From Swiss-Prot:
Associates with the 50S ribosomal subunit. The gene is der. PANTHER family: GTPASE DER. The lineage of its organism: Bacteria, Pseudomonadati, Pseudomonadota, Alphaproteobacteria, Rhodobacterales. This is GTPase Der. Keywords: GTP-binding, Nucleotide-binding, Repeat, Ribosome biogenesis.
Length: 487
């Protein structure tokens, strides 16, 4: 469950006590003095069979300046913006205060889902405060006692339908990946991918990169309008924003994510949460655009982001931004390509495009590179063609014979797309050196025109379950007939 719940409210209403009860650990400092929680704390909550992320926020303050209270308020507002659900707590014994009314109005405007909870509601002394809470216009309040664990069943009953709704939305947005193929579907020709891009199923693209690489500026340029906040301060986009657009008549859903910093430099808890939100955006994408700053490309964090996308099995496009201010473009481009080949060999051949988000130069190339990467990611190769290719690869470079035992590669087929996944039936799969697997993968890339996309190669022994058993007789003999015709 990827649900995120932010607990918000005035200082000292019991937010950290509830946080500790949901998380099951004393991660948040609890004190009777207002303002003890000065940053955001995140934990994995358990409530019945619900599992979700819970954020304990600093107490909402009315200050809007650069004082500590002002910074706490802004931090809390950002948490409200990125959370799926806000649990707004008041102190039932104190009743509704003017500040509660101010913050209820803020939440009505900033959050799609607000749950009102009247905490410290044990005993008759809290009855008047619970009744007052109705006047906030946020629906019926839940009576809670975070200290004694009362009212959690009622909280569960309110959360459960919202969690189900959000899980369904997440499933609808999640791309199909690791799609199993039916070997009976082929007819000897290269099979077109059935995953057409439509307005109902737009191409899902995540734009990721270090802070201030120009992600929001790039998307604003694609949109043709200022939809996202941009500025020179690193990390100005703190949450992942999803926008559905038609880019050159291609329906897309683009995720602009928080810049991903090195962990040691991520000091604000909110920014740490935003990094994990960016990582989630990678999982929801089909194509990941890794945006680099031309002045400082391929830093360690860039490499980690690209490697994460490859490990998640997503198509990758490298875009180098701020190309308009680069003076020696030819030398710089050669340098970039050499660095790419050396530092990211697992993405050999992936598109590398230079762009200027500021001027719009290079956006056509970026659009075409995204479509090309998506097409390769969906590629399917017929079994007969694969086995013709395998024979040639074996003749050119036979597999090794560890301890005198020759490894025999008998048969190959494609088992998955999105990304392409291939299975080789062979003897002694556990003895196959990694270098020979790389030889086969690199050959697949070169000979079947699959640059850059992740390729999964699985070796199976004869004792493993044969996924092709039971194929129709005419298909089972297709390879034999083909080989006979070659003789």
């Amino acid at each position: 469950m990827s649900l995120t719940l932010a607990i918000v409210g005035r200082p000292n209403v019991g937010k950290s006590t509830l946080f500790n009860r949901l998380v099951g650990k004393r991660l948040a400092l609890v004190d009777d003095q207002p303002g003890v929680t000065r940053d955001l704390r995140e934990g994995q909550a358990r409530l019945g069979d619900l599992r979700f992320t819970v954020i304990d926020t600093a107490g909402l303050e009315t200050a809007t300046d650069d004082s500590l209270q002002g910074r706490m308020r802004r931090l809390t507002e950002r948490a409200v913006d990125m959370a799926d659900i806000c649990l707004f707590m008041i102190d039932a014994r104190a009743g509704v205060t003017p500040n509660d009314e101010i913050f209820a109005d803020i939440l009505r405007r900033r959050s799609a889902h607000v749950i009102l909870a009247a905490n410290k509601a044990e005993g008759a002394a809290a009855d008047a405060g619970v009744i007052e809470a109705y006047g906030l216009g946020l629906g019926e309040p839940i009576r809670l006692s975070a200290e004694h664990g009362e009212g959690l069943n009622e909280l569960y009953a309110v959360l459960m339908p919202l969690a189900d709704e959000m899980e369904q939305q997440a499933e609808e947005q999640a791309p199909e990946t690791d799609v199993d193929l039916d070997p009976e579907d082929e007819d000897g020709e290269e099979v077109a991918a059935p995953h057409a891009i439509t307005r109902e199923k737009p191409l899902q693209v995540a734009v990721v990169g270090r802070p201030n690489a120009g992600k929001s500026t790039l998307i604003n340029r694609i949109l043709g309008e200022d939809r996202l906040l941009t500025g020179p301060e690193a990390g100005i986009t703190r949450d992942a924003i999803s926008l559905q657009i038609d880019w050159n008549d291609t329906p897309m859903r683009i995720f602009d994510t928080a810049g991903m910093r090195k962990k040691a430099k991520v000091q604000e808890k909110l920014e740490k949460l935003s990094v994990s939100d960016g990582l989630r955006a990678v999982k929801f994408a089909e194509v990941v655009v890794v945006l680099l700053d031309a002045a400082i490309p391929f830093e360690q964090q860039d490499l980690r982001i690209a490697d994460l996308a490859e490990r998640e099995g997503r198509a990758v496009v490298i875009a180098v931004n701020k190309w308009d201010v680069e003076e020696n473009k030819q030398d710089k481009l050669r340098e970039l390509k050499e660095s790419f080949e050396r530092l990211l060999p697992q993405l050999r051949g992936a598109p590398l495009v230079t762009v200027s988000a500021k001027t719009g130069r290079g956006l056509e190339r970026l659009h075409d590179a995204i479509l090309r990467a998506h097409e390769v990611w969906n590629r399917r190769i017929p079994t007969a063609a694969l086995n013709r290719w395998l024979i040639g690869m074996l003749e050119q470079h036979p597999p090794p014979a560890p301890q005198g035992k020759r490894i025999k590669l008998r048969y190959m087929t494609q088992a998955k797309t999105r990304p392409p996944g291939f299975v080789v039936m062979c003897s002694h799969p556990d003895k196959m050196p990694e270098s020979y697997s790389r030889y086969l993968v690199n050959g697949l890339r070169a000979d079947f025109d699959m640059p850059g996309t992740p390729i999964r190669l699985t070796l199976r022994g004869q004792g493993d379950k044969n996924p092709y058993k039971g194929r129709r007789k005419k298909n089972a003999g297709a390879l034999a007939k083909h080989l006979k015709s070659r003789g």
